[in-house]
């Protein structure tokens, strides 16, 4: 992935593609106090795995490394998804919304799940008859994976 620019092919009026470069300065980090909302989607299954946030620094680190790096609002620091569990998110593609204040990142998920509660997706609960139920099986044991951290308690 290019370190300075995210490229997106777009259709022009002659129905041919042209390259449109989006730099960090083209993204609107101001709407959410220096952050972008980031939706993470599995490139193979198209399932939404999680939602996180990036600041300009974590966005740049993501472009540099090719792995998703978030900004943690609760810890007030950068964190690469999988730095504790090994369940990293390798960037396949990135898209921005029309306001350029949110990103959709499709990824190759390296590991059995992304949720710190042991699920493939953080969206593992479904509303049924006015109740939230766990609708997915756990894909790993959070106690085993995060035995030396506070991640399980979050």
Locate predicted features:
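C-terminal binding/interaction regions
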Residues: 16-35, 43-49, 54-154
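Compositionally biased, intrinsically disordered low-complexity segments enriched
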Residues: 1-14
């Amino acid at each position: 992935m290019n370190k300075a620019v995210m490229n997106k092919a777009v259709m022009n009026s002659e129905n041919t593609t042209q390259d449109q470069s989006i730099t960090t300065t083209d993204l609107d980090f101001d709407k959410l106090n220096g952050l972008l909302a980031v939706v993470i989607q599995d490139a193979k299954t198209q399932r939404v795995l999680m939602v996180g946030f990036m600041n300009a620094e974590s966005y740049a680190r993501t472009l540099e490394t090719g792995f998703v790096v978030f900004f943690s609002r609760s810890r007030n620091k950068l964190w690469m998804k999988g730095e504790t569990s090994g369940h990293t998110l390798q960037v396949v593609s990135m898209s921005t919304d029309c306001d350029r204040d949110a990103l959709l990142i499709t990824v190759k998920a390296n590991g059995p799940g992304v949720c710190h509660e042991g699920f493939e997706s953080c969206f593992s609960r479904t509303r049924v008859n006015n109740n939230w139920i766990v609708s997915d099986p756990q894909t790993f044991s959070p106690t085993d994976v995060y035995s030396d951290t506070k991640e399980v308690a979050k």
